[in-house]
Structures are given as structure tokens and as C-alpha cells.
């Protein structure tokens, strides 16, 4: 049980959110993997929101207990989420409170919380404007044209979805969004048949140009709508607070989003998540090691504060928060959503690259950053497909190589799922020049799973692969088959059993970036480009048909 918070201001109103422990976590996990396994009798038998509530949500008694606790604290408008996993109440900051129940930061005392509370979060109406010391990302390079990329993957230029039920989605908070005029210009420039009428927002927030996440949203929209031609594309921005753009407000926004989306009566079949940062476990390890090695030059608190000044480096509050986000991703897989996400742009060591400056803290962090592997989140989650990056050697589309920043490695927090065990053991057993064994978690979830072109980041490759899977889902719907849902198990089974058919192996590259050690690309799966880049004929053969 953990209490966490966003920066607290003198705002007049705020909310407390109690995230409840799952009522049946073991059963939820077992069902997820059964529904995801093509060899299981339950394969692709996705569940409704009502069915999911009994697994992912808390018990009715726990929800009632949390609601009573919030009311006792002075909360009003107490609401239980549709999935039964959260209880929210509104508070007036100016109201009189019993000081014995609250901390100086305006949070309930840990000793007073009900035992069923997995996480308690404070949402403030107002957030401080963020100031970060790493420059904003410039407009990304696009690299090869859409049609050249399609040709390299064997995808017909004008192959498009034809079933009106096919829906794909991209999400981000803060300034995340796009302008239809820019998408129209991109359509003409790239000679790609994007159906502009089927690209729409599903929220009242439409983003704001000039922000880093607006550029992210624009890239996501053009990629997924170009590769998932004619599928309905939903653009979702569920939280415009400035704290969600670059800092720890992002983790709260993602937790809210995945929890809410899984509770909807209707969900998209494909969701691409390009944004992320180092995982909270990586951030903790980074500062723990740096502080230890610095010999008193700075404190652990100072190190953690420094990381919060770095753009999109540590955007999640805690491992406990990440576990709840994972529960939401698990729920989405059970609903029939294929979730894909960027593997990161800093190889195995960074969020983007080394820390800037010559002070004691960045110097120590850069040393530790190269000594250990620091996975990102969310794409190394066991419950989504992680997408790495490739480029073309000498601009030759027949010679794919790993993109220089393609993120990859092994999660510190999550163990490898069963479908990875044999392949990962083979990679670690046969590959020369691996990083020191103490620098990574050999039993962790390996990532990425597959890759695609990333001229200037895996934020390009994730929606690309998302769009491709939308075409596969469309073919399945037209054939009377269910959507794919979580596809990781099937990807690994197909790639291992039919090497080179659905994914073209990429054997050139390394995840070391600016450091002197990293994971090398090799024959078969590797933690640089995964199983390689898409091959349409194999994909439609093995994913567009039964089961």
C-alpha cells in the first residue's frame, strides 16, 4: 500500500483516488495467458467490461470501505469506476480538516488507509508549469517515404481496411494532438491514401501546437493512419495538465487512461503508445548506485530531484503505480486490444542519451548509466508488444540494420513470460560480447519484440506496426474471426516456428549507444530489434487466419 502525489499547489479543489487491489489477481493472470495462447482452448475468447469487472476490479466490500473512508475524510461526490478498480472523491482545499489524519503535504496518513488500497493518488486541479533542462525534441526526421517502407515490408501501396468495425487508437497527454491541415499536407507529399474523414479525436482535448507531445501526436497519427489505411483512427488526449508533458504527472495520466479505456463498452482493436521514460525501478537503481559511488557528494533526495528536471527521463511515480498500469494493459488485452509501444530511443542505457552538464550529479549518473542497463516503461511490460527501431544501410531497403538508438534489454521489474524462456536462454547462451552479467536482469522480460523504421526514434516505429496490425485485424474481422488482442505469445511462436517468414531478421547493430557495452544484434531474436522487421506475406498468412 503506497501513497503518492503530484505537486501540490494552493488549488481550491482536488481529488483523491483509491486504486483497489484486484479481487482475483491469480485468476486474472491465468485467464490472460490462456486467451493469449494460440494453443489454448480459450484463445481469443475476449471478455466484456462486465466480465472483466469481477476479475480486475476490487470486491464490492473493498469499494464500499474505500468510499466510506474518503467520505470520513470530508470527500464528496464519491464514485466507483465502471471497472470497480478505483474509488474517487472530490475535496475542497479550504475546508476544515482534522489535522491528525493528514500529512503536511495534504495527503491522508498511511496508517488511516483501508487495507484494500493498493495506491492512493492526489489529483490537483492546477499544476505548475514544468521547466526542464534537456531541450525539447526538434521535429523528427521522417526517413524513407511511407511507400518505400511499405515496399520494403511487402505491403501493397493502397492496401486498406474495408471493415467499418476496424478501429485503431493513439494516446498521449499534455499537448498531444494533431492538425488536420498538416495531415492533409503529409498525405499529398507522401502520396498515401489517408482517409481524413476517419481520423478523429475521441476526447474534447485536441492538443496544442508548440508542445513536445504535439509533435509526438502528429507523428503517431500520420504513421498509424498511413499504414492502417482507412481504419477509423481515434486520437485520445485525456489529460492536458503541464505535469503530464514531461514529468511524473505522465504516469498518473497513463494509469487513468488504461483503466478507463478497459472499462468502455467498445474498445479499439489496436492501441499505439509511443510515449514513456525510464521505468521507476531503473530510476531508483540509477540514483541508488550514483549516490553510493559519489561518496557523499550529493544525497539520494538531490539525485531524485535532479532527475525530475530532465525531460521525459523519469515519468512514473513508483513500481506500485507501474503494476497498476500493467493491470490496465492486461485488462485491455483481455478486451481484445493489441497494444504496441515504442522500445525507447536510448539503447539499453538511457531514456534518450547521457545527462548534460559537468556537476557531480550528472557526472555520476553518466558513469552509472553506462555500467548498468536501464530499461524503459511501458513497452517492456509483459502485456504489450514492444517495437524497436531499424534503418537502412546505405539507404538500401534490402539491407535493414538496427537504428542507432533502438531501445532493448531486460526488465528489472517483470520476469520473462513463458513464451520467451527458450529463445532468450539461447540468445544469452550463444552470444559473444554480452554486457557484464551483473549489469542486467537475465530473467527479466526481454524487449523489443519486433521493429520497424525509426528515422529519429521508435515513436515512429510503434504506430507503423500498429497500423500494420490494424490491417491484420481487418482481415480477421472480414473472415469472421475475433481480433488478435495481446499478440506477444503468437508473435514469438510464429517467429520461432517459421523463421524469416513473418519477420525479416536484422543481424547488424548494438544497443550500447554512447557506452562501451550493449547487446549485439544476432541471428534470431535479440534485444536490439527483436525478431526483425515485418514481412506482409508471412504476417497475413500466420496472423490473418485462424485460430
For each of these PLM feature ranges, what is it?
Residues 349-357:
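Active-site-proximal loop/short-helix segments
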Residues 195-197, 235, 340-341, 386-388, ...:
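Acidic/polar loop patches that form or flank catalytic/metal-binding clefts of enzymes
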Residues 460-473:
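Active-site-proximal alpha-helical segments within enzyme catalytic domains
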Residues 2-79, 88, 93-342, 346-347, ...:
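Substrate-binding/charge-relay-adjacent region of secreted/lumenal peptidase catalytic domains
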Residues 81-83:
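Short, glycine-/polar-rich solvent-exposed loops and beta-turns at beta-strand/coil boundaries
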Residues 427, 437, 473-527, 547:
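An often Trp-containing, charged/polar helix-loop segment at the C-terminal end
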Residues 352, 382, 386-424:
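Polar, glycine-rich mid-to-C-terminal structural blocks
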